[in-house]
Amino acid sequence: MQRVLSLDPAGTDMMIALGLESWLVGVTHQCDLPEGIELPRVTRCSIDRSMDSRQIDDHVRQQQSSGTPVVLHDSEAIAALRPDLILVQDLCSACGIIPQHLRLVLESHPQVESMALAPRDWSEILESIDRLGHCLEQPKQAESLVRRLEERRQRLVDNSMQRPKRRSVGLEWLEPLYGIGHWTIELLKNVGLIEQLGEAGEKSHPIDWNRLMEVDPDCLLVACCGLDANRAQEEFQRISKPGQWLKLRAVEMGKILFLDGNRGFSRPGPFLIDRLEEIDRWLTSDSPQRVAMAPEATRQKLSNR
């Protein structure tokens, strides 16, 4: 058994899905662990939780321009955990620890191996799981997990063939407006949601308000990076001006879904399928349970109309 330190929430999710959570010796402040498991958290975030969307965006840009990471790690705590392997993401320096941030730690402890995870689509997510399983000498567990995830995804595709496709726009941030990218667009297509303002595999991108109005999607999905569904809904209500958002057909008709952008689509890991299954149930169910709905003025469930 190896001592694994995960500095990537998606990597932590992979360890848990592989049944190897007992191998973990430490995680980030962002990681979610199974009930009853407590581990040292070796990172912290410089973002004040009281900041609104605009303030958070300004802070992140300021930190990046000065070369200061938004997420900070505790080098002494990492060394004290004596990891054999460190998992780290290599997609976004604004969201977490990247390999460059660990240069001094790894140089000081050359016996420690590191694995950078940077999947940009569903196939690369599965490849990352397989690679991690082989690295930890648990290839059969990884192969089994990959097979089960693919079977679940295919069932969603089959389900979606029984209903009309919907034109959708996904938002990763609200102020300023940013559209979804990477793996999310591809996965949403599996449940019949066709993104109108982004391309699968591409990075998240700024969205022009006029362009959003022009597209006028059938439904709107809000999954703000790092924010849960309730916080995303609060931000939506805060920045919504009378008549502005309501010009969108999706909002006017209540065809809007707030998603957990922290535990959900911001993590390229195995639990993306769970989130996708929740959306599939929401698209086909008459019950509003487990759904964070739109503001009071537009509070209606998304129907099949």
What label would you give each PLM region?
Residues 1-305:
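N-terminal ligand-binding lobe of clamshell/alpha-beta domains
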